[in-house]
């Protein structure tokens, strides 16, 4: 079955303190063909993690939570959301039918990576 993937990131502007949501340019296609029995939140979480690492700039320091910093504010801890919608016959997302989703901040993604090794 065809699914359409949408991924966004919420970044906090350090000057204004405002949170800005932007689309993530996916490293893999937005339209995917996946067996319906395999499409679930775990699939979405795995894809979200892989998209984060595909977009990750090694020059960026690891994310830190507020209790790990002197300023008592999160650092490099952007929040990512990936939503999977069923796709229409012409490959467009059917926004009324969400198939799966995942939402994690960068700190959680790094924590997952530590458990892999």
Predicted regions and their residues:
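Acidic, low-complexity, intrinsically disordered interaction modules
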Residues: 19, 23-107
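Short intrinsically disordered terminal tails
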Residues: 1-2, 111-117
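Short, extreme N-terminal segment that most often corresponds to the first beta-strand
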Residues: 1-28
């Amino acid at each position: 079955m065809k699914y359409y993937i949408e991924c966004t990131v919420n970044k906090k502007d350090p000057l204004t303190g405002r949170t800005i949501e932007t689309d993530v340019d996916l490293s893999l296609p937005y339209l995917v063909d996946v067996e319906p029995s395999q499409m679930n939140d775990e699939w979405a979480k795995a894809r979200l993690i892989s998209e984060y690492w595909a977009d990750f700039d090694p020059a960026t320091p690891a994310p830190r939570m507020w209790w790990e910093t002197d300023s008592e504010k999160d650092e490099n801890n952007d929040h990512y959301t990936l939503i999977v919608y069923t796709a229409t016959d012409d490959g467009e997302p059917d926004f009324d039918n969400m198939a799966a989703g995942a939402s994690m901040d960068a700190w959680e993604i790094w924590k997952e990576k530590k458990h892999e090794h």
